[in-house]
């Protein structure tokens, strides 16, 4: 009995256990089903942001941080609008309504994922929004404005592109045939199975 208790005591001193949340270290093993995206909403009823709202969205994730307020809303843009009206609001969790529900659930947050990234967790039927702001006219850029003035953009003709592909393909075939000859000819080639 004494030997058994000493063995158990020595085993417990060597073993250590920790508890980790799913999102802390293994979140990369469960990638989001949808990629993050930019969200732009328009609401003609509210004059706070006449050009609409602009936000960064991360679907199927929520932030479990300090909440400013909670409410039920019909659409996610109402949730974003409430956040834009409150200066302390930095981010929003929007929980989409289930089949039996008519309204979604909104959480206004006083901090975001950049404040504490470990508080981001995967969560189905929810979307995390951050960087919520009024959309400015400068947010929309034309293609001509995006290119620098001094840069020269030249487009290749389809004939040139086809010719380059043929040249690349012929170079590849030459290299491949040289490697096959080297493999077959050098070092005895293939050996018969014994």
Swiss-Prot record:
SMART domains found in the cross-reference section: PAN_AP
Pfam families on file: PAN_1
Disulfide bonds: 49-134, 79-106
Keyword Disulfide bond attached: yes
Signal peptide (residue range): 1-15
Gene3D superfamilies with a match to the protein in the record: Hepatocyte Growth Factor
Domain PAN as annotated: residue spans: 49-134
InterPro entries: Pan_app
Keyword Manganese set for record: no
Keywords: Disulfide bond, Signal
Domain of life: Eukaryota
The protein's name in its UniProt record: Uncharacterized protein B0361.9
Species this protein is from: Caenorhabditis elegans
């Amino acid at each position: 009995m004494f030997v058994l208790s000493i063995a158990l005591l020595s085993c417990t001193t060597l073993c250590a256990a920790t508890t980790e949340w799913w999102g802390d270290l293994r979140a990369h093993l469960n990638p989001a089903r949808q990629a993050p995206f930019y969200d732009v909403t328009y609401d003609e009823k509210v004059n706070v942001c006449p050009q609409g709202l602009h936000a960064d969205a991360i679907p199927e994730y929520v932030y479990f941080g300090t909440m400013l307020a909670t409410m039920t809303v019909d659409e996610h843009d109402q949730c974003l609008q409430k956040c834009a009206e409150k200066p302390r609001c930095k981010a929003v969790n929007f929980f989409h309504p289930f089949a039996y529900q008519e309204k979604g659930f909104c959480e206004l947050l006083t901090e975001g994922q950049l404040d504490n990234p470990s508080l981001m967790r995967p969560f189905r039927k929810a979307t995390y929004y951050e960087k919520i702001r009024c959309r400015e006219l400068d947010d929309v850029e034309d293609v001509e404005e995006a290119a620098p003035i001094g840069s020269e953009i030249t487009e290749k003709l389809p004939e040139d592109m086809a010719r380059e592909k043929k040249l690349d393909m012929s170079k590849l075939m030459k290299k491949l045939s040289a490697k096959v000859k080297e493999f077959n000819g050098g070092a005895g080639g293939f050996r018969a199975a014994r």
